[in-house]
Amino acid sequence: MKLYPRTSSGLFSLQSLLKSGFSPTLNSIDRFLRYLYRLQKFNCILQFYSQLDSKQININHRIYSIVSWAFLNLNRYEDAEKFINIHISKASIFPRTHMLDSLIHGFSITRDDPSKGLLILRDCLRNHGAFPSSLTFCSLIYRFVEKGEMDNAIEVLEMMTNKNVNYPFDNFVCSAVISGFCKIGKPELALGFFESAVDSGVLVPNLVTYTTLVSALCQLGKVDEVRDLVRRLEDEGFEFDCVFYSNWIHGYFKGGALVDALMQDREMVEKGMNRDVVSYSILIDGLSKEGNVEEALGLLGKMIKEGVEPNLITYTAIIRGLCKMGKLEEAFVLFNRILSVGIEVDEFLYVTLIDGICRKGNLNRAFSMLGDMEQRGIQPSILTYNTVINGLCMAGRVSEADEVSKGVVGDVITYSTLLDSYIKVQNIDAVLEIRRRFLEAKIPMDLVMCNILLKAFLLMGAYGEADALYRAMPEMDLTPDTATYATMIKGYCKTGQIEEALEMFNELRKSSVSAAVCYNRIIDALCKKGMLDTATEVLIELWEKGLYLDIHTSRTLLHSIHANGGDKGILGLVYGLEQLNSDVCLGMLNDAILLLCKRGSFEAAIEVYMIMRRKGLTVTFPSTILKTLVDNLRSLDAYLLVVNAGETTLSSMDVIDYTIIINGLCKEGFLVKALNLCSFAKSRGVTLNTITYNSLINGLCQQGCLVEALRLFDSLENIGLVPSEVTYGILIDNLCKEGLFLDAEKLLDSMVSKGLVPNIIIYNSIVDGYCKLGQTEDAMRVVSRKMMGRVTPDAFTVSSMIKGYCKKGDMEEALSVFTEFKDKNISADFFGFLFLIKGFCTKGRMEEARGLLREMLVSESVVKLINRVDAELAESESIRGFLVELCEQGRVPQAIKILDEISSTIYPSGKNLGSYQRLQFLNDVNEEEIKKKDYVHDFHSLHSTVSSLCTSGKLEQANEFVMSVLSCMPR
C-alpha cells in the first residue's frame, strides 16, 4: 500500500493531510523523508519537519539525522549546530560522528572559519563524548596552519593525540605543522615540535617530513646540521627528489646563505635531476631578492630554452627584483611579455609594480596602474590601496594618502602607515584624527600599531596615555617587543624623565626581550644626566648579557667620564672593567687610548695600553692615534708603544702607520730611533716604501747629514725602490742650501733622464739658491734653458729673480724681470713687490717705488694676503686702506715698515706659515720698535750687533739689547 504518490503534487497533499489532522506512522514519515533526501529536496524536508514539530509528533533518531543533514546540505550551519545540539543524544554513534564531521568541515572549509570549527570540536569532546574522525582533526590543523594560527593548530593536535581520542597523526600533519611554524618565522618551535614527536614515538619521519625540517634548520642558520642530517639520511637509504632539494635551496635562500643555495642546486643537477618550474622559480626568486637580477634573467632564458614554461610566480619574482633595484622600465618590458604570452596576471603582480613606481616617486603612473587593473577585471583590495597610501606617504603627500584611505575600508596597516607618517611631520591634529578613525573602525590592534600609537602619545606629551596603553597590552594579547621598550625609553629620555625611563628599563630587564638598543639609549641618557656610576653599571650588565655596545654610546660615556673626572675617571673605568671578559671591552679600551691621546694625556694612555697588554688584548694603533702623538711632538712615545707592543697588535699596523712615526721621529731629530724603527718594521714583514725613505732622507738633510742622505738615496734602487719626484726635490733643495749647485743640476738632469717630471718647486729651489748668492746669470740660465717647455715659472720664480738683482743693486734688471713676466701674466708675489719697492726706495727713486706700491695694492694675490691678516686682527680700520692712504700721501718708507710687519706677521719665524702675531702699527708707528723687530728676523744683523758690543766690552748694553729684541719675539 502506497501512502503517497511519487509526484510533487503528492508531497503537497501529504502536507495537507498533516494540516487536516492526519497522523502518519513513524515508518511512513521516515520513508517519506528519505525519499525527499534522495531527491535533494532539502527545503521540503525542513518544511515537513516544521509541520511535524508543530503537531508535536514524536520522531525517531533516523528522522533527526535526515533533518540535520538537510540543514548541513543547505549550508545552514548555525541552524544545523543548534538542531544537532538539541537532538544529538537521539542520534546513533556513527551518524552523530559523521554529522559533527560535516558541521566542523562546513565552518572550517566552506565558511573559512576554523575557529568556529574548533569551538564545536571542544564542545563535542567535553559534552557529547563524540569523537569526530581523524580526517576532521587533520583538516582543522591544515586550516589553522594556512592561516598562521599555530596555537590553535597545536591545540587540535593535542586533542587528537590525548588518551581519550588517541588518533595517530601522520607525516603530512607533522610536515604541515613544521611548515606552519616556519611561515610565521618561528623555526625554533618547528624544530622543537619535530623532536618531541620523534622522541614520543608517535612519528616515524619520512622524506616529506624531513623536507620541511630542512627548511626550519636553514631558517635557523644551522647549515652544518642540515649537512649532517642529509648525510645521515643518505646512509639510511633515503633518495632525495627535486622537491627535497628545492625546499633545501629555498631554506638556504631564506636564511641568507646564497652560496650554499647555489651549491645545492649544482649538486641536484649533477645528480641528474632536472629543474622543474618550482625549482627554477625558487632559484630566480632567491637571486632576485639578493639583488642578482641579471643572473635571475639568465636563468629565465635558460628555463625557457629547456622547455620549462615560467609561470606568474617566476615572472613576479624577477619583476620584484627589478623594481627593488629601480629598473622600472625593464620590469615593464617583462610585464608586457607576460601579457603577450597569455599568462593571467593577478593583484600581487600589480602591487609589486605599483610599489616600484611609488619608490621612484611617479605617483601619477601608480594611479594609472590602478585604472589598468580595473580594466582587466582585477578589483584592487586593501593590499593595493595600502601600497599606494605608503607611496604617497613616502613622497611626503600624506594628506593625499589620507584622502585615499577615506574611500576604502582600511585595515591596521592603513592606519599605522598614516599615523606613522603624521608622527614624522609632527602633525598632532592629524595624529588624533587618525587615531579616532582607527578606534571607530574597531580593528584589532597589532603590535606594530601599538608601538606607533605609543610613539604618537609620547610625541604629544601624553605620557599617561602612553603608560596606560603599555599596561593594557596583555589584555590585547600583545607582548612588548624591542621597539616597544625602545620607544618608551626614548620618549622619556628625550624629555629628561630619567626616573620613568629607568622604570621602563627595569620592565625590559624582567622580560624575555634582550634589546641592545635600549641599553645603549639608557646609557646615553644617564650620561647626559651626569649619572655616570649608574651608566657604568648598565654598561657592565650589557656586556654580561652579551649585547652590542654602540660605538656612539661608548664614546659618549668615555667623553662624559673624562669631562667629569679627567684622566683619573677614565683610568677608574678601565680598572673597573678588568673583571669582565677581555674581548667585550676591547673596542672601548682602544677608544679610551685614542681619547687620552687626543687630550694630550699620553701617560694615562700608556697606562691603559699596559693594562690591555697584561690582559692579552689586541691593542690597535689606528693612524689617528699615531698621528695624534706625532702632531703633539710625542713621536718618541709612539715609537716606544710600537716597539713594546705584542705580535697581535703589530699585525694591524701597515706601512702607513710606520711611516707616520718615522716621519715624526725625523722631524723631532730622533734619527737613530727612526732608523731602528725601519729595521723593526722590516723584521715584522712590513715592506717600507719610497714615502718612508723620503722621510728618512729629509731627516738626514735637516740634521746636516747630506752625504748620508745621498748614500741612502743611491741604495734605493738596490732594494727595488724607485725614487720619486719628492725624493729628488728634497735632495736638490738641500744641495742648493749647501751651495752645491752643480750637483743639484746634475741630479735634476738625472731625474729628467729617468722620465720623471720636475715640478716648479724643484726648479725654484735652484733658482732661489742661485739668487740668494747673487748668481743671477745662473738663475736666469735655469729659467730660460731648463724650465722652458717643461714647466711654467710662477710668482715665486719671478720674486726670487727680483730678489737676486735687488741684492746686487741692479734695479734696472730687477724691473726688467718684473715687466717681462708681467707681460706673460705672471706677477710677482708679496715679497717680489716688497724687494722692488725697497730697492727703488733705497736708490732714492721714490716715484717709481710709489708706482710699484700702487700696483702692489691692486695685485690679487697681495690683496688676498693682506685681507687674511685683516681677518686675523679684526681691526676696525683696513690695513690695505691704510697702505693706500700712505701711498697717496707719498709716505713710501712708512708703507714699507707696515709691509715688513705684515711679512713678519705671516712668517714670524721666517719659515712657519701657521703662526701669527698681532700688528701694532695702524696709528703711531714706533720707529725704534720696528728697528728692534727687524733684528728678530735677521740673525746675522743680531749676531753682528751683539758681537760688536761684547768685543768692545759693553756687556751691559749687549744684555739690554738682547732682552729688548726678545721682548719683541712672538709668544
Swiss-Prot record:
Pfam families per UniProt: PPR, PPR_1, PPR_2, PPR_3
PPR repeats: 101-136, 137-173, 174-208, 211-245, 247-281, 282-316, 317-351, 352-386, 387-421, 422-445, 452-486, 487-521, 522-556, 557-590, 591-625, 626-660, 695-729, 730-764, 765-799, 800-834, 835-869, 870-904
Transmembrane parts of this sequence: none
Keyword Transit peptide appears in the UniProt entry: yes
Family recorded in the similarity comment: Belongs to the PPR family. P subfamily.
Transit peptide: 1-64
InterPro entries to which the protein is assigned, alphabetical: Mito_RNA_Proc_CCM1, Pentatricopeptide_rpt, TPR-like_helical_dom_sf
Protein name per Swiss-Prot or TrEMBL: Pentatricopeptide repeat-containing protein At5g57250, mitochondrial
